[in-house]
């Protein structure tokens, strides 16, 4: 036989040089008989290697195994030590567990039969080489040692999974040198990547692993395989006797685990299904942590699961006597101590009497007989694996409280969340064994050092910082389940009994990680609602605000809140310049947020009287000179308790006050922009997230940007052309008074030519073929290159076109621009004739499951919506003429020119002529009777039935999450938003110039439900058919339904043109189109035709049948005509899409009733509360 195996012949000379003493692996100063430690090895025990082979005092490989030339141990030729014995002298010159650089000089050869009958190394004395210089030669066909070879270069690798015969209960005892394979041998073969070593040479203890030197995740992995799994072999018998792996989690099938890879490696077809293998071999992953490479990589260390050796999770110091399981490493002060039973030797002895405590602490890897260890395996798994999130067994290392803190901190990181709760990484074509453990519950801890000083641990804990308060809130809800579900008759260990009543940090983390997806979702919703409630908002709308609705709220209201915050900073800066100190904070629910002089809403900063409820907004405070007279007079006796509004208030009596502190607003602004970036919500605000502008500086002064130099948005060339367009059409904030529009207007967002070029370059990049840059080149263009010309021509054309439109539309364009900004609608150019409007939305279900986003899109564009199917939930007995005839109401007369006028008729006379036209009272030819009633407390049953029948309850219901009325203060009266009952007589076909509701503009959104309509008489069918044929294809109705009312709805941006048209065609005083005021004119077919042909304004026509609802956005002019006698119920709501437009209309409505004015003055407050609720819901969302 050859003196050297063939796979070692090409070894360099320096690798084959024998040590000085002549015996490979012999340690100086030791006798040949002490070359091997006589000790047993527990399952899961790590054994380090030096120069590719085992070389520590704990080495238990067979005699003659290949050793390195440095710090090696002696090997005995011919006869090895007896099993079960150990030598205390081994520990004399050692310093505890030491890792050396390990590097395979040669790849192992794997060939030959799958399961050889006998195993054993070829002893040098049986070979032809020199026994002292020729190392052990393996039989190439019978290699039992399966090593981890897919490792980092010059990094430690792990012990071969081969055990002595006495550890294999299923195998008969053989010669001392016959070492059968362990039940789960693994092979990793591959080249060594060129990366720095993880451990230094000759270092004491462990070094911190640098995550920067981990192997890249995309590095190709080596082929893996298993040996000795042929039918009838020892390994196959052991696998069959082993049964299902203890590492397998409950509910996990073998399909998701590793298959038999032995035939793949050896060339045998895998025809017989094999039993599932454990995810990691015993003793491989022990003290190096659970991640070798970063999450998501397919490297070896990451795919290895937790080690098989269970650990004792209970706290307490370790027991001093030695001889404990090698799986328990030396514990620092405060670490989790090992189980008592693991420390006692079955022989009743521990370490020798001559060993010191220091030596016992260093000799942490001493092995105890595995019989006792294997007996406790299932017991420990039953007790602790589920409690401490150890699927299939706990790690062999002891874990300190600092490690628990690290685990809690890592659990909140995005990487860990993505790896632990997301789908498992895709397996490669030939995955390594152990990948089956990857999943939703796979441990994703980073490598941590075990041996270290207490000072280092404290320093690391200080660097980590305190934990989040939300984690403590979650931990308080968890229940301790330690040692509650164990086998009958099994006694708990002493340390577990001591910790039975405590709920540790690690236990809470494990409980939280083990929650089902439904429980996690419920817990997240509870935490989100708790966070929102702590923010101070109302409990109703914030309790169940989901992620989709919160994003919609924030996308529609975030820009407006930024404008409000910008005005707030300007107000504070002006107050500081006037010498005012920090504003006082006061917020009482019963105080109306309304200016006592201009009746505009108060967002935050304002002036108030210290003796009464008199308040002034910032604009009125400037006019009144608030805060100035106090310095001049120097006395405050001039204002007394007599400070009623009739007597007026002295300027010195006003105090600068805030409802919300500036610090709270700054935090909300910062968090809102962070949520925008997190969920990719597109905002178009001017503000730059800088909390320093809110913080008061030295001497009470605040750093505030001047009003003349607002921050400008950074240009981009990502194809977003609407961003620049929306910024250019920015108008003063909705809360500004009309008198301040001219003075408070900000300059254009493009003060320089460079910014103008940047803002238009995006459009030009998309429009021209030869332009692919955001800015024009500085160098002159070639004669054949017209890029500069195209850019300049486009800029000039856009400016000129805009100026032409402004001149053509007159002074009302700026108000119309505000309307366009509120609805994000393009301005319709003036043409002789326009094409019909776009298709309208008709919802067949009141609460659509799949059409909600479609409704939001149409609603954002300012289009009306028709909804059918409401009659299914309406109780006809509550809305019929017989039930409503007993109710009272106000009867009004409506004419074609003028608002409704009250009459002397009572409601009884009105209801008698409702169904019988011959009994109706005598009226003028150009008038129609109406009846109006507010549904209040006496109509509780009807209000309840209406609330349950409302379509799109997120918008229309009072407590809808997208209805800003639900965010208003609780003490505010909502009379304008209460349901209103309207009944009207039908209009004859020959009187088409009359309507049941004249052309008007509502300040808020409107929904009108037709609850009842009288049956049509036979002559009316022909008139209805003629009427439908004259719609010119601009209407929407449901075929086959009983058409009862006709709606004409115009665009909101066309209101200014319609107003000018009415001033031309209507008598003086009848052509006003004031927001919130009753209509004074009805446009018949002739006037609508003139408006369409001469002014380019067209309308949508909707035909409404009983049981249908029409939704009209705020600011959209509309009128209604009843073909028959009808009863309808209308209700107003405040949607986020039209909130900015509603605020502008509120300022323009001079004749609004006081209760309406008080309601709309709180719009800014509702926006603030809605944004705060949305930010709170999205801040912790995933």
UniProtKB/Swiss-Prot annotation:
Name of the protein: Lysine-specific demethylase hairless
Record-linked PANTHER family: JMJC DOMAIN-CONTAINING HISTONE DEMETHYLATION PROTEIN, LYSINE-SPECIFIC DEMETHYLASE HAIRLESS
Transmembrane stretches, start-end: none
Keywords carried by this UniProt record: DNA-binding, Iron, Metal-binding, Nucleus, Oxidoreductase, Transcription, Transcription regulation, Zinc, Zinc-finger
Primary localisation category: nucleus
Gene: Hr
Enzyme class: oxidoreductase
Organism: Mus musculus (Mouse)
Domain JmjC: 939-1150
UniProt motif LXXLL motif 1: location: 561-565
Cofactor: Fe(2+)
Intracellular or extracellular location(s): Nucleus
Residue ranges, compositional bias (Pro residues): 307-321
Its EC number(s): 1.14.11.65
